[in-house]
Curated annotation (Swiss-Prot):
Organism: Saccharomyces cerevisiae (strain ATCC 204508 / S288c) (Baker's yeast)
Record InterPro entries: Ig-like_POM152, Ig-like_POM152_1st, Ig-like_POM152_9th, Ig_POM152, Pom152, TMD_POM152
Cytoplasmic side: 1-110, 170-172
Modified residues (Phosphoserine): 45, 60
The protein's name: Nucleoporin POM152
Gene name linked to the record: POM152
Region annotation (Cisternal side) ranges: 196-1337
Membrane topology (UniProt): Multi-pass membrane protein
Length: 1337
């Protein structure tokens, strides 16, 4: 062993052991590695005892060591040859290969290791093929072949991968964790490839194995490949190909366009259409016969077209209205030398068309490709509106669309409001309960005969869509029809038509919406008017008010005595209309209206005008006497009539020497009807005072006081009791009220006080005198004022106890008595005293208030039965646009009104207003027997089975179009939200059924033209409606021991205790079940069906399946299952769906099908009764043979014709041998003998493949020759070549013929159709052959 490590004695190439630490070496020495605690087999530590690491000894070592550094470059090259040189003085011997390189080089060691691994894997593949073939595979467990396979190769692979690192082969020595990963990977690979899944590579190997190595025992006793003994194609020889050039075909409307004829040719100047026909022929077309059916009478008419009735098309693209890509399939039609042409046929009538016949110039008929064409009237639509072209805010649009066309139709229309366009599309428009083949999602180019029997679905049907929503803004409104598409695909686009045509043919509908005018009545001063008053009607300025003029105003006038009433109607083109009040009386603003809309009176509506009186003045003079000096001046008492204040002028003259000189001139103002004016000359002398003119604010021009003499007074330079009013403001009284006025008195009482009360509007004066006033203060009680107007309380004089009477000129007290009583009423713009509002919205009820603000209005809210719900009190600062804001429905009644100073009256005829809610959109589930109402908001849909479609029909109430929003919760809890838009008042919700479980459909909200999705308040108050439907799973039942074979004896079939039980697994469904079983009897090839009811996990009368079983094998399968829910599953398949029952008896044998004639290639099958294995002896064509059968059948391949006879039979239980050669069993011997017949053959054209060309209309003869036993039955086909994938040509069967009862050995066929004629099946008196080569291709 020592010499083994002294390798330098034997080779001049240096160290060639693995593990050397040379530069360039791919593997470092273990001396340079870190110490790792692993098994020694993989890695060794430098801490091993020194004696285990021996120094290398060699005679040439020293010289070699000195040259190591020079040899590094050559050492690097030798690395590829697995030679390593170490400059160290000691080497880790445990890192060297286990097998010396002198014995086997490193590269070869690697090669052998890889070859060994591949051998293991090939053997694994061999066992895998056996496993996949279902053959026994030995291992740890006898029955579980897959476990045997996995355990076997887990041990082999693990052992190989675990031991491999021990050899220290470079590049094949792995770390322990890598080895464990390799073992795990191989284990997972073994589990994966041995599973039941199909893999392409394994399938290819299995298929190749079965094809190359599958052999079967024949009746001669030898193992023969079935495919080699019987070549079916050898019995079919020859074929005849007939060619007819060229092929003449025609196709109507090849581009599958849709056509229609306009009902009104004034709009579209079209009265005919040209439909193309695609012709594949070199000859000219002479005659075309069209079948025409009237859409309304279904009457059929054949129309003959000659050359003059159609024309040739150079460019078929001109007929294409839709996508040009459809011409790609006809791209070869336009190549040079093509025989394809296009003709155009002119059609002028609506109806159904198809080509019946086309004849060319040689009087030959062209082949017609079926294509139907329905030409209806083009769809039309119109818009109508029931209202005026000029409408007001609050009116309804009242627009309806009338559509006529072939349903189902689609309408696209636009709504334009002040230039902003809103587009809408309504699809699937059709009458209720309408059925049509056009309702399918795919377009149809041909129709069934049942659909053509009644063409009413091709007629134009009317559909109406009504839009009714309230208008909330002013401006220009327009509805336009953009496009309409019928069910056949005809599209009529109106967008490019001029506006004039759209209006003429009701394709657009326009109207204007105007704002409501508002106005109030005002009283103004007018000096030019006889009454000095004018009436002004002031309108609010609104947008585009100029377009709404003229305004119409209705005024009523009532004279002052309330005796006559006059109505005045005036118009104005401005926002303010001023009228002179020529006559006194009451002026009332009755109503206003603009050019288009009735108006609202938002402020004061009544003005009372009186006739003013010209001011007059009465002057009385009293000397001012002084007890000492006598007269010192004059006191003037001035009495005025008219409306204060008054203005008067005085001139003072001084008399000197008989001359009168103007001494002074002054202008005075009197605020009351009485005034006291004193004049004391400043100097001694005689003076003359002249009152010249008087005026007031109504009569501004001064009025001369005449006669002058009465207004001229003289005085010379020649003090006293007094009284004054303690009132610092004017009194304001309501009509019918009275008041108190305090008076302060000065002087020596008792006093006598005289005062006047004057009506300024009539100049009437009433004097009152109060005597014996003993105090210095007194309160004057005014009378009750029954007439409204301005009054003046004026103090006239006072007399004290000395009897001195002093006239008073103190300021008067002004009393303003209201002429009117405040009133309140609802301001109705229309005769209807009702407003409709949306739920959750607020509306304003306009009020009409008269009086002086602010106002306090009380009203009450009542229900429709008159019961008071609540009372309210509102305050209004003025009478400009007063309105009550309400948000609840009911009756609102005015109760009381008070203005700033007076209690008012309510006008009861206009004191009641009704507010009701617009009808909320709602829906109702249509009653039928498929849905049940559980609670008010919960419905239960009839339970269905998985895969059955169901719908819920809803009736919708409100203003269309509707939007229905609902949630759909699947059984897995997933919730999806959906919305549908419906233009009619009926909707259907489709309920899914793909997954079993409970589906919950929650209808969350419905919106219509009044209540939209933006109405959050309405959305929050909608109650949800829930529809539940349970989808039951399809029942699934399988045999607990699927694929297992049960055994029973024929004698014990009727005794249940001796029968093996048949157990079921209930995988899915609701018990009890009703299951239909099929029992296939191999011996008779007969199948019996049994239906067993009330089956569950504890109750199954399986013994019924054994009834009627005779000797032999019986396959029991489950055909269908019906569970307690009524769900049916008839698609059960797989190995778990079948079990086998073998009924055995004492050794017996009989032919499985004694009535069958056996042929070469068939399987001769005998049924064996007894306990396997069986020993069978038989003869074939006189040659004695024997076989040991381990199954219950003796099956042999009939490899050649002859007679097979059974001579004896023995089983393994009784060891009884049945000798059928015994004369006593001659009848059984004859019954068990079979004659195997040869396969019949057929040849065409003497077995040659012949091509025969004939012209159109000529005929050819096809001769079939037979071999076999008559009578013969022949099946032959005619095939033609068509284009296949990737441009390859392939044959396609166009005709199949079967001829029976041929008693001769030859059969002839006369034909004029092109194609290849060949036989595919032949039957003689006994046997049948099929050309597998033909069917496989």
């Amino acid at each position: 062993m020592e010499h083994r490590y002294n390798v330098f004695n034997d080779t001049p190439r240096g160290n060639h052991w693995m593990g050397s630490s040379v530069s360039g070496s791919p593997r470092p020495s273990y001396s340079s590695r870190p110490n790792v605690n692993t098994t020694r087999r993989f890695q060794y530590s430098d801490d091993e005892p020194a004696e285990k690491i021996r120094p290398l000894r060699s005679r040439s070592f020293k010289s070699t060591e000195s040259n190591i550094s020079d040899e590094k470059s050559r050492i690097s090259e030798r690395d590829s040859k697995d030679r390593y040189i170490n400059g160290d003085k000691k080497v880790d011997i445990y890192s060297l290969p286990l097998i010396s390189t002198d014995v086997l080089e490193i590269s070869k060691q690697r090669t052998f290791a890889v070859i060994l691994f591949l051998i293991i894997q090939c053997y694994k593949i061999y066992d895998l093929v056996i496993l996949k073939s279902g053959l026994p595979l030995s291992g740890l467990l006898f029955k579980n072949y897959r476990f045997n396979f996995i355990s076997k190769y887990f041990i082999i692979d693990s052992f190989f991968l675990y031991v491999l690192p021990s050899f220290n082969i470079p590049r094949l020595t792995f770390k322990p964790w890598v080895v464990y990963l390799q073992i795990l990977a191989m284990l997972l690979l073994n589990i994966f490839i041995s599973s039941d899944h199909e893999f392409v590579l394994i399938s290819l190997i299995m298929t190749t194995w079965r094809k190359l190595y599958t052999k079967e025992l024949s009746v001669t006793g030898s193992a023969i490949n079935h495919h080699r003994i019987f070549d079916s194609s050898a019995h079919f020889k020859g074929a005849l190909t007939i060619k007819i050039l060229p092929e003449n075909t025609a196709m109507f409307n090849p581009l599958h366009e849709s056509y229609c004829l306009p009902m009104d040719t004034n709009l579209f100047k079209i009265n005919s259409i040209d439909v193309p026909i695609r012709i594949n022929s070199t000859e000219e077309i002479e005659y075309i016969e069209l079948e025409y059916r009237d859409l309304y009478t279904n009457s059929v008419e054949l129309r003959s077209l000659s050359k003059k009735d159609f024309k040739i098309i150079d460019n078929p693209k001109s007929f294409l209205k839709k996508d040009q890509s459809v011409l790609k399939s006809h791209s070869n039609d336009f190549e040079e030398g093509s025989t394809i042409r296009y003709l155009a046929v002119t059609l002028q009538d609506i109806g159904f068309y198809q080509i019946k016949k086309i004849v060319d110039s040689k009087k030959l008929n062209l082949k017609i490709h079926q294509s139907h064409l329905v030409v209806p009237y083009c769809p039309i639509a119109s818009i109508t509106g029931t209202g005026s072209n000029d409408r007001c805010i609050g009116d309804s649009d009242n627009v309806s669309f009338e559509i006529q066309g072939v349903p189902p139709m689609k309408l696209a229309y636009s709504k334009i409001v002040n230039g902003q366009t809103f587009s809408y599309v309504d699809s699937s428009l059709q009458p209720e309960y309408f059925e049509s083949p056009l309702q399918s999602s795919k377009s149809k180019q041909s129709f069934t005969q049942g659909e053509l029997n009644d063409l009413k679905w091709g007629r134009n049907q009317p559909v109406n869509i009504n839009l009714d929503s309230s208008i909330t803004q002013d401006g220009k409104f327009a509805y336009k029809i953009d496009k309409i598409t019928d069910g056949l695909g005809n599209v009529v686009d109106f967008t490019s038509l001029p506006e004039e045509l759209k209006k003429r043919y009701d394709l657009s509908y326009n109207f204007n919406v105007h704002e409501v005018p508002r106005a109030a009545l005002e009283e103004r001063f007018d000096p030019k008017s006889p009454t000095k008053r004018s009436i002004a009607i002031v309108f609010e300025e609104i947008k585009n008010w100029i377009s709404d003029i003229p305004y119409v105003i209705s005024l009523s006038y009532t004279d002052a005595q309330d005796k006559s009433k006059k109505i005045m109607n005036v118009t104005t083109d401005s926002l303010t209309k001023v009228l002179q009040a020529d006559l006194p009386g009451s002026y009332n603003l009755e109503y206003i209206e603009s050019k288009f809309c009735p108006g609202e009176i938002v402020g004061k509506s009544n003005v009372l005008v009186t006739m003013p009186v010209a001011p007059t003045m009465e002057v009385k003079s009293f000397p001012i006497l002084d007890q000492c000096v006598g007269q010192v001046g004059l006191n003037f008492e001035l009495s005025f009539t008219g409306a204060p204040p008054y203005y008067y002028n005085t001139k003072i003259y001084k008399l000197e020497n008989g001359e009168r000189k103007l001494y002074d001139a002054k202008r005075y103002t009197s605020e009351g009807t009485r005034n006291r004016f004193s004049y004391s000359p400043p100097k001694e002398g005689n003076y003359e005072i002249v009152f010249d003119t008087v005026s007031n604010k109504l009569f501004t021009e001064p009025i001369k006081l005449e006669p002058v003499k009465e207004y001229t007074f003289k005085t010379s330079m020649r003090v006293k009791p007094s009284a004054s009013l303690k009132l610092h403001h004017d009194l304001k009284l309501c009509l019918g009220d009275h008041s108190s006025v305090p008076v302060a008195l000065k002087g020596q009482g008792p006093f006598t006080l005289t005062y006047d009360i004057i009506e300024t509007f009539s100049s009437k004066r009433k004097t009152f005198e109060i005597k014996e006033i003993k105090t210095n203060e007194y309160v004057i009680k005014t009378p009750v004022f029954t007439t409204g107007g301005d009054y003046i309380l004026s103090l006239v004089s006072i007399k004290d106890s000395t009897g001195c009477v002093v006239g008073l000129s103190q300021p008067d007290a002004k009393i303003q008595v209201r002429r009117d009583i405040p009133s309140a009423a609802f301001n109705f713009f229309e005769p209807i005293k009702e407003a409709k509002i949306k739920h959750g919205s607020v509306t304003e009820i306009p009020l009409k208030l008269s009086g002086e603000g602010p106002f306090t209005v009380k009203f009450k809210h009542m229900d429709y039965d008159g019961n008071i719900v609540k009372e309210f009190e509102n305050k209004f600062q003025n009478s400009y646009k007063p309105a009550l804001k309400v948000s609840k429905e009911g009756l609102y009644q005015l109760v009381d009104i008070r203005d700033s100073s007076c209690q008012g009256n309510v006008i009861y005829r206009n004191s009641l207003y009704k507010v009701s809610f617009l009808e909320k959109p709602k829906f109702a589930i249509q009653d039928n027997h498929h849905i049940t109402k559980v609670t008010e908001n919960l419905f239960s849909k009839e339970e269905v089975c998985q895969g059955m479609e169901g719908t819920v029909d809803l009736a919708l109430f409100g203003s269309p179009p509707f939007i229905l929003e609902y949630d759909l919760m699947a059984p897995n809890g997933h919730i999806s939200t959906k919305k549908i838009q419906v233009a009619t008042k009926y909707a259907s919700l489709k309920l899914p059924n793909q997954i079993p479980g409970e589906y919950i459909t929650t209808i969350k909200a419905i919106f219509d033209g009044n209540y939209g999705e933006s109405d959050i308040h309405f959305r929050e108050h909608q109650s949800e409606l829930i529809i539940k439907q349970t989808v039951h799973p399809i029942p699934d039942v399988a045999f607990a021991d699927g694929g297992k074979t049960l055994r029973a004896c024929a004698a014990n079939v009727d005794q249940i205790s001796f029968l093996e039980p048949i157990n079921l697994k209930f995988l899915q469904g609701e018990s009890p079940f009703s299951i239909t079983f099929s029992v296939y009897h191999e011996s008779t090839s007969r199948t019996d069906q049994y239906t067993i009811d009330n089956i569950d996990s504890e109750n199954f009368s399986f013994e019924k399946l054994y009834e009627g079983m005779k000797l032999g094998n019986h396959a029991i399968t489950i055909d269908s299952v019906v569970d307690a829910n009524g769900c049916v599953n008839s698609l059960i398949s797989g190995p778990r769906n079948q079990i086998l029952v073998s009924i055995t008896d004492a050794p017996k044998i009989h032919i499985l099908d004694p009535s069958t004639e056996y042929c070469v290639g068939d399987y001769v099958a005998y049924q064996l009764n007894g306990v396997a294995p069986f020993m069978i002896k038989y003869e074939f064509n006189g040659i004695p043979l024997k076989s040991k059968e381990r199954s219950s059948q003796f099956v042999r391949l009939a490899s050649e014709p002859g007679i097979i006879s059974i001579t004896s039979l023995q089983d393994s239980s009784s060891q009884c041998i049945v000798d059928f050669t015994n004369p006593k069993l001659k009848s059984e011997f004859d019954d068990l003998s079979l004659n195997i017949h040869p396969i019949p053959s057929v040849t065409v054209s003497q077995g040659n493949y012949v091509t025969e060309d004939i012209r159109e209309g000529d005929q050819a003869e096809v001769i079939f020759s037979f071999e076999g036993t008559p009578p013969f039955s022949l099946t032959y086909v005619r095939t033609e070549e068509t284009d296949g994938k990737h441009g390859k040509r392939r044959s396609q069967v166009v005709e199949t013929h079967k001829v029976t009862d041929i008693y001769s050995h030859e059969y002839k066929v006369i034909t004029s159709l092109q194609g290849t004629y060949e036989a595919i099946e032949i039957t003689d008196a006994y046997c049948f052959a099929k050309n597998d080569l033909f069917f496989n291709n």
